């Protein structure tokens, strides 16, 4: 990485760190007037602040850099092999199964050093992507992971006591999207995934295992892919052309997308030298031979030329979009109802007043709701009381009627008992009289018989 590019980035980062909250209002008329009032002066002698870029470069070299790559592609498409080849390092990534029930993201961080530059490299691999029968929501874990890294950085940024210089930035700087070399068109899963990622990360599409497709088919495939991306509104990363030193090569490389790549850590002897290549019965595919694949172009564009721009785009475009949406959800804005600049304190006081009014309104609603529910409950209880009273009166009336019936039956029964007793007494008297009469008659007959016998 050139010192001028590092200095340019660090100056930009220093400016962004102090004026992040007012980025959206810099185009206002007031800011324009302020810039017009700045005068340019010529110094009469040497001061020394010309060494500021060198100071920033030295400080940056001491702190080191971080770069985070997201590899999205089907299992076995060659993601790990390409990363190993790009950084000329064996990262010892283990093979993934084709039978994962859902998509998982696995992040591994490594510390690399080239000359005196230290790089903290994080590689995020999508495990199980495209292996499910239902692939409709396969992109969602990737989106959630990217948002989670943005949220972690935002929370660190919003802390009262923060340390962004020592904070391990895990935001994804580039997404290498591996496309299967079918030679036909993009899969629906690829279009859907890239469409949901293009506003959150810098996407660089690559055709994996390009040695399985002929050059003619590969060129047609590239044209077909770019046509589908444009027609579906997928925004992929474009190499910047605003820097005159790299504008020409970047413009040419933009026309070469997507890159058709081949990865390999195996060395094969070609001529008198050993090169990274793939050995086949029909010949050798050299990884770093531009006539065989676009690996060198990808490495030059990704690492040697535009790594810093990818980091800047992540911070100034994708993260700022996430940050703005989150702050707007919280009620923060740069301008008021009359399009006048609003400070954070004013926004805070306005939201505080709004929340206070909302709380009072909800408290009043809760009180009214409580009173209403109490009234409804009282009405229900009174209605239940009336029903119980009516039921009680009804039962009481039935009880009285039943009691009267029983009293009547008792009276009739007592009358029957008295009548029966009278009849019984009469019957007993009559029976005794009859018995006495019968006994008298028997004695008379006996006496008469005795007299006749004598």
Curated annotation (Swiss-Prot):
Pfam families: Septin (PF00735). One of its GO terms (cellular component) is motile cilium. Proteolytically cleaved in vitro in a calmodulin-dependent manner. One of its GO terms (biological process) is protein localization. InterPro entries: G_SEPTIN_dom, P-loop_NTPase, Septin. It comes from the Eukaryota. The keyword Signal does not apply. GTP binds at residues 73-80, 128, 209-217, 263, 278. Filament-forming cytoskeletal GTPase. May play a role in cytokinesis (Potential). Widely expressed. Abundantly expressed in heart and kidney, placenta, skeletal muscles, liver and lung, as well as various tumor cell lines. The lineage of its organism: Eukaryota, Metazoa, Chordata, Craniata, Vertebrata. Residues 63-329 form the Septin-type G domain. GO terms for molecular function: GTP binding; GTPase activity; molecular adaptor activity. Residues 125-128 are annotated as: G3 motif. It is found in: Cytoplasm; Cytoplasm, Cytoskeleton; Cell projection, Cilium, Flagellum. Residues 73-80 are annotated as: G1 motif. Residues 208-211 are annotated as: G4 motif. This is Septin-10. Keywords: Cell cycle, Cell division, Cell projection, Cilium, Cytoplasm, Cytoskeleton, Flagellum, GTP-binding, Nucleotide-binding. Septins polymerize into heterooligomeric protein complexes that form filaments, and can associate with cellular membranes, actin filaments and microtubules. GTPase activity is required for filament formation. Interacts with ADGB. Belongs to the TRAFAC class TrmE-Era-EngA-EngB-Septin-like GTPase superfamily. Septin GTPase family.
